[in-house]
Amino acid sequence: MSFVKEFREFAMRGNVVDMAVGVIIGGAFGKIVSSLVGDVVMPVLGILTGGVDFKDLSIVLKEAAGEVPAVTLNYGAFIQTVFDFVIIAFAIFLMIKALNKLKREEPKVEEPAEPKLSNEEVLLTEIRDLLKK
């Protein structure tokens, strides 16, 4: 089997394609949530906390010296990232909960079909019925 053919079979399996689609959608979803947090949630939270811009929150560890920039601990950006994570984790939790609920629904139970009798069994049944008469 050629390398290309093996790779094509691997790539076209359902699980690999599903995973690739999930990664692409997840990346896009992450960008949407980051925008939601950075452009909507954090400004509102900043207004509620007295006009604080979370992007600018930092602690200066070492002052700037000449052309060397200051060393800062940017905890405001960290707070934004934590909000991103919480929203994404909550959305994933809701999706997994919905999928588990769908999986838990009881599958339809197939009633067993009556076994098909072989030719010998059919003949023996007919003979038995004739002898009963």
From Swiss-Prot:
Coiled coil location: none
GO cellular component, one term: plasma membrane
Short name of one Pfam family: MscL
Assigned keywords, A-Z: Cell inner membrane, Cell membrane, Ion channel, Ion transport, Membrane, Transmembrane, Transmembrane helix, Transport
InterPro entries (alphabetical): Mechanosensitive_channel_CS (IPR019823), MS_channel (IPR001185), MSC/AndL (IPR037673), MscL_channel (IPR036019)
Biological role stated in the UniProt entry: Channel that opens in response to stretch forces in the membrane lipid bilayer. May participate in the regulation of osmotic pressure changes within the cell.
Name this polypeptide is given: Large-conductance mechanosensitive channel
Designated gene of the protein: mscL
